[in-house]
A protein has these predicted regions:
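Loop/turn elements at helix/coil->beta-strand transitions in domains of secreted/extracellular proteins
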Residues: 74-76, 123-127, 172-175, 203-207
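Sec-dependent N-terminal signal peptides
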Residues: 11-19
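Hydrolases whose catalytic domains are alpha/beta-hydrolase-1, hotdog thioesterase
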Residues: 187-191
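Active-site catalytic motif of lipid deacylating hydrolases and related acyltransferases
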Residues: 28-39, 82-174, 308-347
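Surface cap/lid and interfacial helix-loop subdomains adjacent to catalytic sites
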Residues: 25-26, 157-172, 194-341, 345-346
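Positively charged n-region of N-terminal signal peptides that target proteins for export
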Residues: 1-11
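C-terminal motif of bacterial Sec signal peptides marking the signal peptidase cleavage site
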Residues: 21-23
């Protein structure tokens, strides 16, 4: 079997991430949350405290081959909240919250989630992605529930502050999309409920993509789950597992699961690989149509093992890190369709 070097690097990258998410971390906080050790708050007037922003060049501006960055002409904004990159994989990553001046962590954030996830939305709107004092991955695994929550609260405070700064200084009445993954989705849920839902601002919400984290069907009172591809003022959510594993383990029927190939939430809704317009793995510039399928199953999205050169080595059963990327072009085109539908409805 001849596996290209770039593909092998990607497979190794996936295997390493799988190891990290399974609990084999080398560095953790190891003590209770201490507010005296919390890094300095961000200043969102500074462009370097944004991972992506229309006023600077960043990885969210890039596109796979054949696509165009349309931020300059878009009538919509996208507020993107990135997932946990602060994984405790190297010395110094032992605070409950990440520092904003950690240049290596920022570079990792930009070359991973900002490039591979935030860029999805540059066909629909201007992208604003704040840097924030993200909680250490241990905040999702530690037995110290008080410290876990305080770390997450610190991270969320930054996200809300960033959103409010964006609204005051750059939004200017424009409709917006909120998109988030994993830890970002945790904060997106709270942000939507605290700042958007049942408030005048909700009228400006094109859609929310709350991906990689559970959204209970009764979490929002006046913000519905999207049930059609062009519905607006609603949210989508999914968590992706390997199909055979998911059929045995998935059991959260009270969680919303959107099929990103059909944009419905019907239990058992299946879409074949032929409906997948293109996933994006490494190298970034290559779209991979038909990389996998999608089926809604008891609160989760089930997918066949993705097919790409070297995929025989990929044995992960939880496809969390690829929730967005397996359906890259479908999500991109859906965000564009919802934005167009929003303006059509307003006119």
């Amino acid at each position: 079997m001849n596996i290209p070097g770039s593909t092998m690097k990607y497979v190794i990258f996936l295997l390493l991430l799988a190891t990290l998410h399974s609990g084999c971390r080398s560095v953790n906080p190891g003590r209770a949350f201490d507010p005296q050790k919390t890094p300095q708050r961000p200043d969102f007037a500074r462009l370097d405290h944004w991972a992506a922003h229309p006023d600077k060049k960043d990885p969210a501006d890039r596109t796979p081959q054949g696509l165009q960055d349309e931020q300059a002409t878009a009538g919509v904004d996208v507020f993107f909240i990135h997932p946990t990159i602060y994984l405790g994989t190297r010395g110094g990553e032992n605070n409950w919250n990440a520092a904003l001046d950690d240049t290596r962590l920022n570079a990792e954030t930009d070359s991973s989630t900002i490039l591979f996830q935030a860029s999805i939305f540059n066909g629909a709107g201007r992208i604003f992605a704040p840097r924030y004092r993200q909680a250490h991955v241990d905040a999702f695994h530690s037995n110290d529930q008080v410290s876990n929550q305080r770390a997450l609260d610190t991270a969320y405070a930054d996200v809300q502050a960033a959103f409010e700064y964006y609204l005051k200084n750059w939004n200017r009445g424009r409709p917006f999309i909120i998109a988030a993954h994993s830890q970002g989705a945790v904060h997106a849920k709270t942000l939507l409920r605290n700042v958007v839902e049942n408030k005048p601002l909700q009228q400006k919400l094109v859609a929310a993509y709350i991906v990689g984290w559970r959204v209970e069907r009764d979490f929002f009172k006046r913000l519905p789950a999207c049930t059609t591809p062009e519905q607006t003022g609603c949210y989508c959510s999914w968590r992706t597992w390997k199909k055979n594993y998911g059929r045995r383990k998935a059991d959260e029927p009270n969680s919303v699961c959107t099929n990103p190939l059909t944009w419905t939430i019907t239990e058992g809704q299946y879409a074949p690989k032929s409906a997948n317009r293109g996933g994006v793995l490494r190298p970034f510039g290559v779209l991979r149509p038909g990389i996998t399928d999608a089926e809604v199953w008891r609160g989760y999205l089930l997918a066949d093992k993705p097919k790409f050169p070297g995929s025989i080595l990929f044995i992960r059963r939880n496809y969390h890190i690829a929730d967005f990327n397996l359906y890259y072009l479908n999500v991109r085109e859906n965000a564009q369709a919802r934005a167009a539908a929003f303006f059509k409805k307003k006119n």
